[in-house]
Curated annotation (Swiss-Prot):
PANTHER family: SUGAR KINASE (PTHR43095), XYLULOSE KINASE (PTHR43095:SF5). The keyword NAD does not apply. This is L-fuculokinase. It comes from Salmonella typhi. Keywords: ATP-binding, Carbohydrate metabolism, Fucose metabolism, Kinase, Nucleotide-binding, Transferase. One of its GO terms (molecular function) is ATP binding. Pfam families: FGGY_C, FGGY_N. SUPFAM superfamilies: Actin-like ATPase domain.
Length: 472
């Protein structure tokens, strides 16, 4: 008997993947290939995406899974991507201009001068989204100022997930959580902001019908089916922006903060209310729409493991095993014997260590970095509680940084709440599959789909004794 699966097509900045997931959230088959942006012909410093190349990479992944998928029934397809990027298209869906990558510097000047149209504070109060140079708003203003005829000719703007969905189904749609990254929405109305559009001279007609996560978009058309090596007629279900599905797929409940710990740490929460007027007071803050209507995802981000990588390179070597650093830091008592580190190496003139003596070792420096980053997390969590109107009782931790058990224990001790570590790295894929199963009618809600998954967490509890390395 063939196994029913949802096929998740995940377009990341570095990899394109096709992953088949069963009803219990288990991965049945997966394939991956490298993804990369292209250099723009207009300027060698500019970056753009080739939609055709991305579709071909999906095709390569799907065809490499043909043997495994022959034993499955693909019940539905979902697409997840990074946010903000997209393109203007004509009535046939043909790109009028290449997809400007979030890595492209051309829109930085637009961000710096956006006050010509609307104050940055009002912009964030309305949209929730922080001032990041890659925001969709700045791309559209750049196109308006540099290629005005294209906006006049355009049938619509499609975010990158919707560009892919259009190639699959022929439907023109706007994925709601992608729009939530754009800085174009009135986040409280869950629709495009008349005030922002009017101020910047952008037409509402550019944005086609909004679809919620889990909603059917259409069915896989013959040409796309042939390209992917799949049967035509498979339902395509809206899944959208990767961040929101990572939160849901990690098992996060409303009011439970999630820390994605990597080179950057991104702290977000699924909140029923948010005070967006506070956001502009805090650099690095943002708020996006949750995958479920009525919820918001306020968040903050800061450089984290990037600091630790710098410390390793400075005091050890880039190849030194992390366990060597951890063992040396674990031998140092909490408080690092008075050595403290201000960890904002990007923006703070006072960044670096204080309290250094002739007895200070590199273990002190690394431990002080771990404690300094945790103090930064503590401040940001308190800020997020204020913005999102919640009180954290535990912190859910995902990402590469969660493998550092000493750091996890320091977090539990300094925050004085349990740290809950999810080892499964495929949270985005899991979340997208849950909405896919809901969208094809297998479950009555995404939550019911999520209830089928057996989550395995490791806990780090606050303690006053020397750090343990094994979670309970």
């Amino acid at each position: 008997m063939k196994q029913d699966v949802i096929l998740v097509l995940d377009c990341g900045a570095t990899n394109v993947r096709a992953i088949a997931v069963d009803r219990q959230g288990k991965i049945v088959a997966r394939a991956s290939t490298a993804n990369a942006s292209d250099i723009a012909a207009e300027n060698s410093a500019w970056h753009q995406w080739s939609l055709d190349a991305i579709l071909q990479r999906f095709a390569d992944c799907c065809r490499s899974l043909s043997s495994a998928l022959s034993e499955c029934v693909v019940r539905g397809i979902t697409v997840t991507t990074f946010g903000v990027d997209g393109a203007l298209v004509d009535a046939q869906g043909k790109l009028l201009y290449p997809v400007i990558s979030w890595k492209c510097p051309r829109t930085a000047a637009v961000m710096e001068t956006i006050e010509r149209f609307i104050s940055p504070r009002q912009l964030q109060t309305l949209s929730g989204v922080g001032a990041f140079s890659f925001n969709t708003l700045y791309k559209l203003v750049w196109l308006k100022e540099n290629h005005p005829r294209l906006l006049e000719q355009a049938h619509c703007w499609l975010f990158i997930s919707s560009l892919i969905n259009h190639r699959l189904t022929g439907e023109f749609t706007t994925d709601i959580t992608m729009a939530g990254t754009s800085q174009l929405l009135d986040i409280h109305q869950r629709d495009f902001s008349p005030e922002i559009l009017q101020a910047t001279g952008l037409a509402r007609r550019l944005f086609p019908r909004i679809v919620e996560a889990g909603a059917p978009i259409g069915t896989l058309q013959t040409d796309a089916a042939r390209l992917l090596g799949l049967p035509a007629g498979v339902p395509v279900i809206s899944a959208e922006h990767d961040t929101q599905f990572a939160l849901f797929g990690a098992g996060a409940q409303q009011g439970e903060p999630v820390l994605s710990s990597g080179t950057w740490e991104i702290l977000m929460v699924r909140s029923g209310q948010v005070d967006t007027s506070l956001l502009s007071q805090y650099p690095g803050s943002t708020c996006e729409l949750d995958s479920q209507s009525g919820l918001y995802n306020p968040g903050m981000q800061w450089l984290a493991s990037g600091v630790l990588e710098w410390v390793r390179k400075l005091l050890w070597t880039p190849e030194t095993p992390w366990q060597t650093l951890i063992d040396e830091a674990r031998a140092i008592p909490a408080g690092a014997e008075g050595v403290r580190m201000q960890c904002d190496l990007l923006a703070c003139q006072n960044a670096g260590w204080q309290g250094v003596t002739l007895n200070t070792t590199r273990g002190h420096f690394y431990r002080a970095a771990l404690e300094g980053l945790t103090a930064q997390l503590q401040r940001n969590l308190r800020t997020l509680e204020k913005i999102g109107h919640f009180n954290a009782t535990e912190l859910l931790l995902v990402g590469g940084g969660s493998r550092n058990a000493l750091w996890n224990q320091i977090k539990a001790n300094q925050l004085d709440i349990p740290i809950k570590v999810l080892d499964d790295a495929e949270t985005t894929v899991a979340g997208a599959a849950m909405f896919g199963w809901y969208g094809v009618g297998e479950f009555s809600s995404p939550e019911q789909a999520r209830a089928q998954v057996n989550y395995q967490y490791r806990y780090f509890w606050p303690q006053t004794e020397p750090e343990i390395i094994e979670g309970v």
